Amino acid sequence: MKCDPSIAKLINNELSRQETHLELIASENFASKAVMEAQGSVLTNKYAEGLPNKRYYGGCEYVDGVEQLAIDRAKNLFGANWANVQPHSGAQANFAVFLSLLKPGDTIMGMDLSHGGHLTHGSPVNVSGKWFKTCHYEVDKKTEMLDMDAIRKKAIENQPKLIICGFSAYPRKIDFKAFRSIADEVNAYLLADIAHIAGLVASGLHPSPIPYCDVVTTTTHKTLRGPRGGLILSKDKEIGKKLDKAVFPGTQGGPLEHVIAAKAVAFKEASAPEFKIYSQKVISNAKVLSNQLQKRGISIVSKGTDNHIVLLDLRSIGMTGKVADQLVSDIKITANKNTVPFDPESPFVTSGLRLGSAALTTRGFNEQAFGDVGNVIADRLLNPNDEDIKEKSINKVSELCNKFPLYSENI
C-alpha cells in the first residue's frame, strides 16, 4: 500500500500481533485467504439497495448472482427455508427481528448479561432495553446451567412477546425444544441468537434451532470463520418477508456486497467435510483447556464446556478479571475479562476471564498444544509476581506461535 504508508504500517503491525500472540478471545477467529480476497474485491464499488432481482439501481446483474449464491448456501448449510445475508452485524440482525415482530413497549425475555447473555438481549444500555420492557432469566446458582423450570416460571410471570435463547458467555448446549415449549405456552415468538455456536450448529455438533425457533440470527465470524457480519434465518417464509423489509429499508441502506461475497465463500467452506473435523477439534480443544485449568486449581463456570467457550471463575484464586486480563496480555495471550454468574464485581472489573478455542484451532493447535496453553495461563495467574515464570511463559508462547504459524503464505 504505497499510497498510504501510515495505514500500511498499522496493518502490518496488526498482522504481526496476530501471528505472535495467542488469540483466545471467544468471539474471534481467523478468516481464510479466500474470504479476505472476496471481501477486498471490486464488489465494494457497487451500490445495490433492495434484494436480488429487486434493486433500485442498475448494473446489479452480477452482485445479484453473488447475493443469491450466499442466500442459497446459507439456507442449505443450516437447513432453513429463508435467509437474509445483508445484516452488517449480529446486533443489526437482532434489531431487524425486533422491528419486524415487536412494537415499542412489548416485553422481551433474554438471558441476563451477567450470566452470559448479550447486550442486544434487553440490556438497559442497549436500544433493546430502551424500547422494550425486559425481563431476564439466569443460570442455576449451584450448577451454573440453565434451569428450564425456572425459565418457564419467569415466562409465565412476565408473558413476553419474544423469548431470546442465545448467549455470549455460556459454555453449555441449549435445549431449543424446551424453549419452544415455553414460548408456545405463553404465545411468544422464539428467537435463537447462535452467534457464538453457528459453526458448531452448521457442523451438526450442536442441536439446530431451525426446527424450533421462529427466527435465528447469527454473526458470520466466530466459529463460522467468515467475515465480520450478520445473518438471519427462518423456516417460515412469511416471517421472512417481514424480516426482509425490516433489514431494508427498515434498518439499513445499501448492502455490503463485498462482505456478502465473503460470506458466500465462508458458507461454502463450512459445508465441506473438513469443516466438521475442524469444529470437532474446536470442542475437544476447549475441553482440554478447561480440564487443564481445573487441574491447576482454577474454577471453570459450570465445571466444563460443550462448545468453544471456557469461562474462568477467578474468585477461586482471589483475583479479578481485570487483573487476569492484564497478566495474560503481558505474555502475549489475548483474552477478555468477563462477568461470571452472580458476580460481586462491576462489569468494568469482573470476576471472570473468557477464553475461546476457535482461533487457535484454526491455526492448527492440537489437544497437546491446548494443554500447554492451559499450563501457561495457570502459571501466569498463579504466580503473578514471578518475573522468571513470566519470561518462561513469553518464551513458551513464542514457541507455540512458531510451531503453528497463522498464515502459511504472504497475504
Swiss-Prot record:
Modified residues (N6-(pyridoxal phosphate)lysine): K222
NCBIfam families in the record: PRK00011.1
Known function: Catalyzes the reversible interconversion of serine and glycine with tetrahydrofolate (THF) serving as the one-carbon carrier. This reaction serves as the major source of one-carbon groups required for the biosynthesis of purines, thymidylate, methionine, and other important biomolecules. Also exhibits THF-independent aldolase activity toward beta-hydroxyamino acids, producing glycine and aldehydes, via a retro-aldol mechanism.
Family note: Belongs to the SHMT family.
Pfam hit, one: SHMT
Catalytic activity: (6R)-5,10-methylene-5,6,7,8-tetrahydrofolate + glycine + H2O = (6S)-5,6,7,8-tetrahydrofolate + L-serine
Gene name in the database record: glyA
Record localization: Cytoplasm
Keyword check for Cytoplasm: yes
A Gene Ontology term for the protein's cellular component: cytosol
Involved pathway(s): One-carbon metabolism; tetrahydrofolate interconversion; Amino-acid biosynthesis; glycine biosynthesis; glycine from L-serine: step 1/1
Cofactor: pyridoxal 5'-phosphate
Protein name as it appears in the record: Serine hydroxymethyltransferase
Site feature location: Plays an important role in substrate specificity: H221
Organism: Prochlorococcus marinus (strain NATL2A)
